[in-house]
UniProtKB/Swiss-Prot annotation:
UniProt lineage: Bacteria, Bacillati, Bacillota, Bacilli, Bacillales
Function text: Mnh complex is a Na(+)/H(+) antiporter involved in Na(+) excretion.
Activity regulation summary: Na(+) extrusion is completely inhibited by the H(+) conductor carbonyl cyanide m-chlorophenylhydrazone (CCCP).
Family: Belongs to the CPA3 antiporters (TC 2.A.63) subunit A family.
GO cellular component: plasma membrane
Name this protein carries in UniProt: Na(+)/H(+) antiporter subunit A1
Subunit architecture: May form a heterooligomeric complex that consists of seven subunits: mnhA1, mnhB1, mnhC1, mnhD1, mnhE1, mnhF1 and mnhG1.
Gene Ontology terms: biological process: proton transmembrane transport; sodium ion transport
């Protein structure tokens, strides 16, 4: 096992260990035991920067099911390293922050178990080269995030938000599964790198469009893109460390990673470029507009996260245009990938810090309601400083890193508007317009975020708690992120050669020469647009109280949340009605539906599919076999007219013993002996149990019931006979019996073929059958124990009375 595999598995192992440690170390905050895990992974990832800078990659394989092409294959390139650094780096700061945020009285064992589970799953997503393994980790992120969002399960809003996120992201996960299966069909491989190398085969496949649509749905749901964004605001009910981790740097970025990783395969399609770009721009505009009207600090950050994700998504879509050009023209559009990667990093820094400050404000004042907050500038000066730095970065104000990536975004929209590709030159003007409008509202909600908390009148009478500056443990992590905001803004070269260029090259192998970010490029369209954004933003802030009321009057039926809630209520009701229409309290009705469907499917298949019934290889029927079958049928027939349970049991046993005799004649003595033992034990058990039951009562049935029963029974019998004859006479595959005959001794070291098949070749099947019997036995034992317990309690009550 390689170090790369250990880096992925380490959080998963500690996720199992941490709850045990929690039982023995109650006095020490559990976060201190968790903190070394992401730090160690982060340090290890830093050592791999030189590898990716030199253009090399790391490929490690751990065999799992090689025959099916499912191995634990890990592939690390510039893109995987970038996300791994974000996952482990931000994860370290979040764990440190959580030590100050969560008290020891919380269920810390559960919290850190879920957090580490999520961390390992995210590392698995961004490092897996096998798409099936990627999917497994992808779904594990949905499951672990569900547990984290519902951590405070006593709150109804937490349960609602967790269920909502799970439903939408799992829907996307199923779409992703369908997409990757369609990708694997033409390439006959589950390797992502192999798919990229054979992208032309996928592009010529009839499944190409369907795979593209399904994978985009998977990415859009995970990264909260329009119209799937509705789960993210409700997920804010999670503890603030969860919001800072999942919803700024990791989970919501998984969809962006998937789009970036799959771009070499799908960039040849105009549908990919248009859809990814327009969905991103629409998300940017819609979410930034909605962020301005939120009354909850986390609500503002939730919609701002959605809008920033839309911005990055749009840049990834624009960058895909580079696949349709050569040389310098290709590099011009590939610069959008560079801008996307840079903003990916910047967003993790300023948004992570803002979430942590929001948690600090909530921890200090007891509320996140902007109507109750205000005037905290002098009370929380350190928090104010961090907020100003990070919020201005989000607004795109120099000299912070957000300004550089926002300028790059605007530049890419103007570049895309000039692309003479797929009629982009006629509609491309929408790109910069939507980008500018979205950036205006981004500026507005960023500045208002500062004003809501720290300016205005201080209202202590409306605060549940007396406001105060929080502890150093809660300030250290956002302070580090705020420092990075300044450093990356003033010295972006720290990232360009080491992180950004290798990550960009992983998306498009076009060489990006001398990537540079500057505060001022001259009077470019992007710079002039920035001035327009500032002017319009200030005007909207000044008139905020007038126009925001119009947004808050949005009819409920025009929101996606309304239709989600309506569907969540209507679908279960219709499902229940449909289920009740064919699943009733009468077992006979249920059996009629089941057996009727079997008969219908059998005869439809018989009359629609050509087949042969071949009796050439059928062995001759001997007289004693006929006698045994007659005995068997007679016993089964007499059960129908039995007037006592004892007679029914005897006839049923006769059927079983008759089958055992057939096994003897067919030279299967062990099987016959087993059948004899089972029948004997079953008969004894039936007799013991039925002894305690009341007498058997027979009810006269209507002739219509009797006729229906006879038709169903006859139809099922005929169907089974037909299926058996067709299966015997139409062997499209070579019989496996020869394999057993040839290998029963050398592989299993047994001479009895039946025993070897049951115990060795089909050992798992036998094991699970035994497990089912064991579970049934436990259920019976539990029922008996409960009955005895109730009888004992009843006797105690009587004695007390």
């Amino acid at each position: 096992m390689s170090l790369l595999h250990i880096a992925v598995i380490l959080p998963l192992i500690f996720a199992l260990i941490i709850p045990i440690l929690y039982r023995f170390f109650k006095r020490i905050h559990l976060g201190w035991f968790v903190l070394p895990v992401p730090i160690v992974i982060f340090i290890y990832m830093l050592t791999l920067i030189k590898t990716t800078m030199s253009g090399n990659t790391v490929m490690k394989t751990l065999n799992w099911m090689p025959h099916f092409g499912m191995n634990f294959d890990l592939y690390l390139d510039g893109l995987g390293l970038l996300f791994s650094l974000l996952i482990s780096g931000i994860g370290s700061l979040v764990v440190l922050y959580s030590i100050g945020y969560l008290s020891k009285s919380e269920q810390l064992g559960n919290f850190y178990c879920y957090l580490l589970l999520f961390m390992g799953a995210m590392l698995g997503v961004v490092l897996s080269d096998n798409v099936i393994i990627l999917y497994l980790f992808w779904e594990l992120t949905s499951f672990s995030s569900f547990l984290l969002i519902s951590f405070w399960r006593e709150r109804q809003a937490s349960i609602y938000g967790a269920q909502k996120s799970l439903i939408i992201t799992v829907f996307g996960g199923l779409s992703l599964l369908g997409g990757i299966i369609l990708l694997a069909i033409p390439t006959q491989s589950f390797s992502i790198q192999y798919m990229i190398q054979h992208a032309s085969e996928i592009q010529n496949s009839p499944f190409f469009i369907f795979a593209m649509i399904l994978i985009m749905i998977g990415a859009f749901t995970k990264s909260a893109q329009f119209p799937f964004y509705i789960w993210l605001p409700d997920a804010m009910e999670a503890p603030t460390p969860v919001s800072a981790y999942l919803h700024s740097a990791t989970m919501v970025k998984a969809g962006l990673y998937l789009i970036a990783r799959m771009t070499p395969i799908f960039a040849a399609s105009q549908g990919w470029i248009w859809t990814v770009t327009l969905v991103g721009l629409i998300t940017l505009f819609w979410a930034s507009l909605n962020a301005t009207k939120q009354q909850d600090l986390k609500g503002i950050l939730a919609f701002s996260t959605v809008s920033q994700l839309g911005m990055i998504m749009a840049m990834l879509g624009i960058g895909a245009i580079s696949y349709h050009y050569q040389g310098d023209d290709s590099k011009i559009y590939a610069a959008a990938f560079t801008a996307a990667i840079f903003h990916l990093i910047n967003h993790a820094t300023f948004k992570g810090a803002l979430f942590m400050i929001t948690g600090a404000v909530d921890h200090s004042t007891g509320t996140r309601d902007v109507k109750k907050l205000g005037g905290l500038l002098t009370i929380m000066p350190i928090s104010f400083t961090i907020t100003v730095i990070t919020a201005l970065s989000m607004a795109g104000v120099p000299p912070f890193n957000g300004f550089l990536s926002k300028e790059s975004f605007l530049e890419t929209t103007f570049t895309a508007s000039k692309a003479n590709l797929f009629s982009v030159d006629t509609l491309g003007y929408l790109f910069p317009i939507i980008g500018i409008v979205g950036s205006v509202f981004t500026f507005v909600y960023s500045i208002k975020f500062i004003m809501h908390i720290f300016f205005g009148q201080y209202k202590p009478e409306q605060l549940p708690k007396k406001a105060h500056e929080v502890s150093i443990l809660m300030l250290l992590s956002p302070a580090i992120l705020a420092t990075l905001v300044i450093v990356f803004g003033l010295f972006p070269g720290i990232l360009t050669n080491s992180i950004i260029e290798p990550a960009t090259s992983s998306i498009n192998h076009t060489v990006i020469d001398d990537v540079e970010f500057h505060m001022f490029h001259g009077l470019t369209p992007a710079f002039l647009s920035t001035l327009v954004i500032y002017i319009l933003g200030i005007l909207l802030i000044v008139t905020f109280s007038y126009w925001v009321k119009l947004l808050q009057r949005q009819p409920g039926k025009l929101t996606f949340n309304y239709w989600y809630n309506r569907s969540a209520n209507v679908i279960p009701n219709y499902s229940e009605k449909m289920t009740n229409s064919y699943v009733t309290d009468y077992s006979r009705n249920n059996l009629v539906i089941i057996f009727g469907a079997l008969i219908l499917l059998t005869f439809v298949t018989v009359f629609s599919v050509p087949f042969n019934i071949n009796f050439k290889d059928v062995s001759p029927i001997r007289i004693f076999e006929v006698c045994i079958v007659i005995l068997l049928l007679s016993a089964a027939f007499l059960i129908l007219f039995a007037k006592s349970r004892l007679f029914s049991i005897i006839m049923l046993s006769a059927v079983g013993y008759a089958v055992s005799v057939l096994f003897i004649f067919f030279k299967a003595p062990d099987l016959a002996l087993t059948q004899f033992v089972v029948e004997s034990i079953s008969t004894a058990l039936f007799l013991l149990c039925f002894y305690h039951l009341p007498n058997l009562n027979r009810y006269n049935e209507k002739r219509s019931f009797q006729l229906t029963n006879a038709l169903i029974a006859g139809g099922v019998g005929l169907s089974v006979i037909i299926i058996g004859l067709i299966a015997y006479g139409n062997r499209h595959f070579e019989s496996i019996s020869k394999f057993y005959q040839e290998h029963v001794y050398d592989l299993a070291h047994g001479k009895n073929m039946v025993n070897v098949i049951l115990v060795d070749f089909r050992g798992m099947d036998t094991l699970f059958e035994s497990s089912v019997l064991g579970i049934a036995g436990l259920a019976v034992y539990t029922m008996i124990k409960l009955r005895k317990k109730r009888q004992t309690q009843g006797n105690e009550v009587k004695n007390h009375e």
